[in-house]
Amino acid sequence: QSPLVFRLARAPGINKILRYVTPRFFIKNTLKEVYYDKTKLTDKKIDTYRDLILRENNRESFINRTNSSPVDYTQRLKSIIIPAQIIWGNEDEWISVDNAKLFSEALPNNRVDIMKETGHLPMEERPYESLELFLNFINEN
């Protein structure tokens, strides 16, 4: 089942309301789904996300993107020949870590790094560890 925020963005009527009303608690609850370590979810971070979503056209763009038809990029991924890094949180509640394997199979020249005790946003939840993985990848390639 897809995350609540996406289900609401697809719901006729509700998605029209979401274009104009985005309560702070809604942002907070959505972020709780993507963070494994809830202690990293500060009031400042919640406010930053709310400020971003409230910017002109952002809500409309999110709803439009959520309601667009899915596209299968598998063949296009297979054509990428440069080294690619896949970083995934093993506790991602939005997109299962099993999908890292699918990306790995589609990308011919890749490295997969699975981060333990990490949710959907490794680069925010564990920025220093994410940076270390990224720099190691860059140095190796």
Residue spans for each PLM region:
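Active-site-adjacent alpha-helix of alpha/beta-hydrolase-fold enzymes
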Residues: 101-110
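Conserved alpha/beta-hydrolase catalytic His-Asp/Glu region
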Residues: 19-79
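Glycosyltransferase donor-binding loop in the core domain
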Residues: 54, 92-95, 119-122
